[in-house]
Amino acid sequence: DSNPIIKVEFRAEYLTRCGYIEAIQRVELFLKKLIPEYEIKISEIHLCADVQGHEFNLLDTYKFKTNSRSTKLFESKDDKLSYLNNNVFTGFSMGNGDYMLRVYNKTHEIEKFKNKSYIKPLKWDINPKYNPNKTVWRIETQIRRNKLKTIVGDNGILDGFDVVLDAIPDLWAMSMEQ
């Protein structure tokens, strides 16, 4: 694919505040005013879930079955993200580039980076099941365009904008099975 004429990147905070459907509608409304005809291609999609009740640890990395050859383990040392240094376990990732799964301590991340704390009042605090005394872990999958356009969903190859959006539940399920 050639470089796009217009590239839109949604920031996590923006998506948290308005949701992906409203964000997309706003972009489409804007584009229609500028360009009468256009085609939208998704270059990358991130799907995530925040969970409580399980404290991930180093042993969990061995419980995951994966086709990936790349697994990175992270620990926190002096508030710097580094590879295993016999300190506090803060997460791991599997895969790289076009297809990746990350599991990380979101509570630790927002304590370390205050600009990411928007998630707490916007989502966690309003969830009756949220326990502020327990750690929140984020499970996140990242799928880039090169991988997306090799996946066949119910509505065909995940190359078109609407096809990818319709396949979000299937992409999440597929990510958890990989």
Model-inferred region functions:
Residues 1-178:
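Structured, helix-rich domain cores that form ligand/interaction pockets
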